[in-house]
Amino acid sequence: MNSKTQKLAALKRQCFSCKKCSIAQGDSRVTSPHVFGCGNVNASIVVVGQNPGYSETIIKKPFVGDAGKNFDGFLQTILSIERKYIYITNTIKCYTPGNRPPTDQEIAACKDFLKQEIEIVQPQVVITLGNYALQYFTKHSGITKCHGEMEHSEEFNIDVFPMYHPSPLNMNKPLTRQAAEEDFRKLKALLKGSVDKVSDITEDSGIGLEGLI
């Protein structure tokens, strides 16, 4: 087990014992609302969404629902990579009741977990999905104005590529889906093969770190 795996496993244990916000304290319709990131610990790409949905709290992995299927489709057909080569996580680690948007207090409570994930994995680029992840890294709001344009996050000292969230609500809108497809093509051109397909794939470690989806 490499040091990145050990660090992420320890961070996940901290996350699952967190009681910093009302959701983690029991203000949710699920017994365990926490969902930690998972994937390749040596990934060149880290994907960051908003927060886990209800189905993710059951499986305990991010992006396993329809949004995840949409995203996987874009990865495979446009970027020509599989999910096993990336690391996926969320800005908020808990399912919000009724899948409502997270509050500022909830975002603040989870901030250190995401920051540490990025520091441990050390990707070349972060793909943000939707407004909340965009705001976390860039302080900008309004994905319609910022999507598809690479920019640098000063706080994290990393390149960030904002994209529309691949939710069914978004992808069922022809213009939004077309924009998402164009953004993936633009990302592929910007990367120009610089993102590695690392071979050190992290499977389930047996100590609590989720393996691949």
Summary of predicted features, one role per range:
Residues 1-66, 77, 156, 193, ...:
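Active-site and ligand/interface coordination hotspots across diverse enzymes
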Residues 2-5, 26, 83-84, 91-213:
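Glycine/proline-rich loop-helix segments at beta-alpha junctions forming the active-site rim
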Residues 34-38, 76-77, 116-117, 148-151:
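Short, flexible, glycine/charge-rich loop motifs used to bind or transfer phosphoryl groups or to couple energy/partner
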Residues 44, 86-88:
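N-terminal catalytic or cofactor-binding beta/alpha core of small enzyme domains
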Residues 61-69, 177, 181:
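Short amphipathic alpha-helical segment that frequently serves as the phosphate-/nucleotide-binding helix
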Residues 65-86:
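The first long alpha-helix at the start of the GST-like C-terminal all-alpha domain
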